[in-house]
Amino acid sequence: MVTAHNVTTKKDIVKPLQYIQETTNILTTPTAYGTTPTSSPTFVAAGLNTEITLNPDVVHQDVDVLGSEDIVDAVKTGELYTFTTRFNPTDSVLLNYGLVSGAGTGTVDASLSFIFSEKLDNTEYFTILKGCLPTSTTLSLERGTWNADMTWICKEITTPATSHGLTSPTFVSIPTASPLTHTDAGSDPFAWNSTATPERRFSTTVTRDMSVLSVNGESTITYAKPTTRRIEFSVDAFVKNTTFLTDFKAKTA
């Protein structure tokens, strides 16, 4: 018979998901990639977080030999880490890491470390996500609050531990700021071809390709940097002229 135990739910999150820059620019300081600042780090809330999904993957190679119909071993050859987060943004700071062009601090040129803690069987455990870079950012709005979904590649997601290993960190508590809504930008927030256009639904996705350095002798990736950015969007707009169709036919950017 299974013994009853304390199941972890959203109420067991103690310190919400929060982050800090590892370096202002991994292009000029690549050795800082994947290194969480340990001396008096000050963390920033990752929006009004509603969901986080960790995706660790152990890469292995099957060992198959003559004389046996079964594999005789499955050898670990590497570790790959990604995670996704869903949140209601209270500002554009975290979003800019995924949306805007690389330009040093506050953009995709700067890798991040995330941390959160949760109660596991009534004991607080910390998880640190190191060397995080955004590979996909989706921002959507439908006459309510802004919703954001971000996918990140990581160098490492640590095993939950009762000690975070940081010296005098400043953590943020559960955020209480109001999320951004469809009215925060005023009336007619959407413009097409320099013309204000009424719409009721909008979504944009920015996808980034990463160049990843993985070498013999290391189980995790050594370094990663952004290489390509692709932007797409969709909008449910009310048609009041022929501009959309004309621009579509002319392939006008």
Task: Give the residues covered by each predicted segment.
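Signature of extracytoplasmic/envelope-associated structural regions
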Residues: 2-253
